[in-house]
Structures are given as structure tokens and as C-alpha cells.
């Protein structure tokens, strides 16, 4: 079981790092070209094999296909990113937990809690990401770190605690605000790529928590 769990954690971390990259910064021309490659399309097809993710992966692939026909695709997609995630007006979907959990204020209690968690686990935020620690990209990256770190554990009791910590993080730091974030993305993202990514992130996180909770029961 331990070897199977290590493989699973590596796959989970890969998906979390990928999701984090979508909300980290605008996609470059090279990034967009990769999304049209056989390698990435195979990766997405693999995700779609999971029934709970199938619909959201389909929406993301449809948006990527539309992107091939979009004039000035990179510039237009960068504008979508800016309008959704970088503007502080009512027609945006800011990717910070504090906005949804702390009277709409930036850098609130969720950011402080994330700072404490990152420090406790010795995780440093990338220097070029000048954002509060409750940014979605940072939270997803941290979850990937927790998944990979669990692979260093050999004893089942400690492993159960590590899995519980991941489940608790999802409950306390992501599912508290991600549904509202995904809803706002859907409301304000006319083209639909980032709203599809947000809904896929939410679906994967919900499914991952269910999987973690089952694993916790098995390791007891």
C-alpha cells in the first residue's frame, strides 16, 4: 500500500502544481502552445477518466480549442487574466481567501494563517510572486508540498496524521472560499478558460478530500 500511496501522492502533487500554475500568472505563447500539444491533451484525457472531473475537463478542453481560433490569443487571454484576477472592482474574481472570508479585505486573517503554515513547514513563496500568502496559487502549491512530503513518512500512524493535515487544510483553507471564487469566475469570464479552470480546481479538490478521508480510514 505504501508504494501505491507514494505514486498517488506524486500524481496529486503534479495536478496541484499544474492548477497552481494556471492562477500564478498569465500564460505565455509557449504555455499556450504546450496546451495544444499531445502531451498535455493526454494528461487532460487522463483527468477526464475520473467521472467527477469529466464535465469540467471537457469545458476546459473546449475553451482551449476555441483559443486556437481566437485572434491575438495570448494577449486576449492575458487580458482575461488581468480583468478577473488583478482588478479590484466588482466585476472580478480575486484569487485571495481573505476577500471571501474577511469582509472583502485583502491580507486578512486567512493570509496570516497561511503565513504561519508556510513558516511551520519551511515553505518559501517564490520571490517573483509578490502576493499575499492566501493567493490560490500559493495554497495549491502548498498542498502539493504536503502531498510530496508525506512520501517521506514510513510509519502508518504518522502517515495518517499527514493525510489528515491535508484533508483539514482543504476543509479549512480552500473549501471555505473556492466555491464562491469559482462562481465569480463563471459569472465574469466571458471566454471561459479561467472559469473552466476554477471549476475543475474545485471539483478536483472536493474529490481529493474524499479520497484522503478514505485513505485515513484505511491507515487507522
From Swiss-Prot:
InterPro entries on file: Chaperone_TorD, DMSO/NO3_reduct_chaperone, HscB_C_sf, TorD-like_sf, TorD/DmsD_chaperones
Cytoplasm in keyword set: yes
GO biological process terms on file: protein complex oligomerization; protein folding
GO CC terms: cytoplasm
SUPFAM superfamilies, per the entry: TorD-like (SSF89155)
Subcellular compartments: Cytoplasm
Top-level lineage group: Bacteria
Alphabetized UniProt keyword annotations: Chaperone, Cytoplasm
HAMAP family assigned: TorD
Function: Involved in the biogenesis of TorA. Acts on TorA before the insertion of the molybdenum cofactor and, as a result, probably favors a conformation of the apoenzyme that is competent for acquiring the cofactor.
UniProt family annotation: Belongs to the TorD/DmsD family. TorD subfamily.
Protein name: Chaperone protein TorD
Organism: Vibrio cholerae serotype O1 (strain M66-2)
Gene name of the encoded protein: torD
Amino acid at each position: 500500500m505504501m508504494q501505491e500511496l507514494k505514486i498517488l501522492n506524486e500524481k496529486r502533487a503534479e495536478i496541484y502544481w499544474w492548477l497552481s500554475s494556471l492562477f500564478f500568472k498569465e500564460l505565455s505563447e509557449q504555455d499556450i502552445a504546450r496546451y495544444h500539444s499531445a502531451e498535455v491533451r493526454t494528461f487532460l484525457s487522463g483527468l477526464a477518466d475520473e467521472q467527477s472531473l469529466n464535465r469540467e475537463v471537457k469545458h476546459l478542453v473546449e475553451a482551449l480549442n476555441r483559443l486556437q481560433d481566437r485572434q491575438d490569443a495570448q494577449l486576449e487571454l492575458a487580458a482575461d487574466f488581468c480583468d478577473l484576477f488583478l482588478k479590484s472592482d466588482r466585476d472580478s474574481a480575486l484569487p485571495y481567501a481573505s476577500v471571501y472570508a474577511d469582509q472583502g479585505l485583502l491580507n486578512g486573517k486567512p493570509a496570516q494563517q497561511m503565513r504561519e503554515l508556510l513558516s511551520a513547514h519551511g515553505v518559501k513563496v517564490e520571490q517573483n510572486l509578490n502576493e499575499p500568502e492566501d493567493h490560490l496559487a500559493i495554497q495549491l502549491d502548498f498542498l502539493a508540498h504536503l502531498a510530496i512530503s508525506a512520501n517521506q513518512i514510513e510509519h502508518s500512524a504518522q502517515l495518517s496524521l499527514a493525510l489528515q493535515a491535508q484533508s483539514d487544510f482543504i476543509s479549512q483553507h480552500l473549501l471555505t472560499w473556492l466555491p464562491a471564487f469559482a462562481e465569480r469566475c463563471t459569472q465574469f469570464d466571458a471566454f471561459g478558460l479561467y472559469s473552466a479552470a476554477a471549476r475543475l480546481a474545485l471539483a478536483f479538490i472536493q474529490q481529493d478530500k474524499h479520497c484522503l478521508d478514505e485513505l485515513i480510514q484505511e491507515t487507522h
